[in-house]
């Protein structure tokens, strides 16, 4: 009896993760369409701008601090980096910038975006009620989504920062 109860509990918990992934899939689909169509209104509804901006700024600052010590230009960069990172966070969080990320996933301008069932199967639980998108099933998270006020929003970007370009 105890083993059966543990098995049911394990299935229930794994089911929650599955439901979470498929719940997020509709919003991830809407985000992908907004990126493809450069639809700022829908993009903004599916992006946690403050969280994403903070995360991008943090990564930019970390990259700046990796500069060679004793380098005068590096010291100036470190001094100015919070201001530059703040501006970059504003400039980089927009649909046309994330088009390179969509291209990386194989969603070019002429590629049909898969339905929510396909997207849900590609998402994986990321802990703390978040889900993430990976390039391969066993690969690292590239995009992280968090549910806020009933909508799953892009809240983290773990990809190569060079993918976020303002000019094409």
Model regions and ranges:
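Post-signal peptide N-terminal segment of mature Sec-exported envelope proteins
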Residues: 24-45
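Sec-dependent signal peptide recognition
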Residues: 1-9
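Exposed beta-sheet edge and beta->alpha loop/turn motif
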Residues: 85-168
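Bacterial signal peptide processing site
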Residues: 17-20
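Early exported N-terminus immediately downstream of N-terminal targeting peptides
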Residues: 40-93, 97-98
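C-terminal motif of bacterial Sec signal peptides marking the signal peptidase cleavage site
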Residues: 12-15
């Amino acid at each position: 009896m105890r083993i059966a109860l543990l098995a049911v509990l394990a299935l229930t918990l794994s089911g929650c993760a599955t439901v979470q992934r498929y719940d997020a899939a509709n919003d991830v689909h809407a985000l992908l369409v907004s990126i493809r169509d450069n639809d700022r209104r829908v993009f903004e509804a599916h992006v946690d701008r403050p969280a994403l901006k903070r995360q991008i700024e943090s990564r930019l600052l970390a990259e700046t601090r990796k500069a060679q010590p004793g380098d005068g230009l590096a010291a100036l960069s470190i001094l100015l980096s919070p201001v530059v990172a703040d501006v970059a966070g504003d400039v980089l969080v927009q649909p046309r910038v994330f088009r390179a990320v969509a291209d990386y996933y194989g969603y070019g301008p002429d590629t049909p975006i898969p339905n929510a069932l396909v997207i849900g199967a590609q998402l994986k639980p990321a802990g703390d009620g978040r889900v993430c998108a990976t390039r391969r099933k066993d690969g690292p998270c590239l995009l992280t989504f968090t549910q806020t006020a009933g909508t799953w929003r892009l809240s983290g970007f773990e990809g190569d920062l060079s993918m976020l370009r303002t000019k094409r």
